[in-house]
Amino acid sequence: MRKMGVVIINFKAYKEGFGKRALELAKIAENVASRCDEYVGIAVSFLDLPVIAREVSIDVYAQHVDAVGFGSHTGRINADMIAEYGAKGSLVNHSERRLKLADIEFNVSRLRELGLTSVVCTNNVPTTAAAAALNPDFVAVEPPELIGSGIPVSKAEPEVVENSVKAAKEVNKSVRVLCGAGITTHEDYVKALELGAEGVLLASGVVKAEDQKRALEELVGLL
């Protein structure tokens, strides 16, 4: 029997995952999480995070934090701020919100100091190994050309998943590796686990689905 897998749903800035619809989807995720054997977390916009973190029992992540502390940083949102509003942690360096190496290290370190979870996104094997060296909780490898494509990385580029897991573990045995890009079905999810990943980071496969509840239920094997 395999151990619990990890499913983190990134709401991005999709209309279907913002405001009232974000809260509705968060409650769907909470309901599905209560009925399956997988860990289900969600990454939501800064504006939705305080409300959703209060309203659901599953873990809620920020999609990004700025690599700054408190001070003269107009328009920035740092790790301390999301902690105060109930976030479990944050994505770091998503392909749509890339950071410099020093900023990734700053965020991972500060999130750890606050007792928050860091999910560092990478795009290939070398960057996965480099990210693992920073000692985040998770590294999520997502080839950018497959993001939102509906073509799962676990099928299109299985060697990227396998080699990323191997490279990360050689650097840091405790880091957990997720894979993303194009994940939409239970078959995609199971394949990712078979390749050595401990779970998936996905977005459009659930958020933009015509029936979000059914899409998530199918992904985690409830259908």
UniProtKB/Swiss-Prot annotation:
A GO BP entry: gluconeogenesis
Protein's pathway: Carbohydrate biosynthesis; gluconeogenesis; Carbohydrate degradation; glycolysis; D-glyceraldehyde 3-phosphate from glycerone phosphate: step 1/1
SUPFAM superfamilies: Triosephosphate isomerase (TIM)
Pfam families: TIM (PF00121)
Main location: cytoplasm
Catalytic residue list: H94, E142
Function in brief: Involved in the gluconeogenesis. Catalyzes stereospecifically the conversion of dihydroxyacetone phosphate (DHAP) to D-glyceraldehyde-3-phosphate (G3P).
Record protein name field: Triosephosphate isomerase
Organism listed in the record: Archaeoglobus fulgidus (strain ATCC 49558 / DSM 4304 / JCM 9628 / NBRC 100126 / VC-16)
Lineage: Archaea, Methanobacteriati, Methanobacteriota, Archaeoglobi, Archaeoglobales
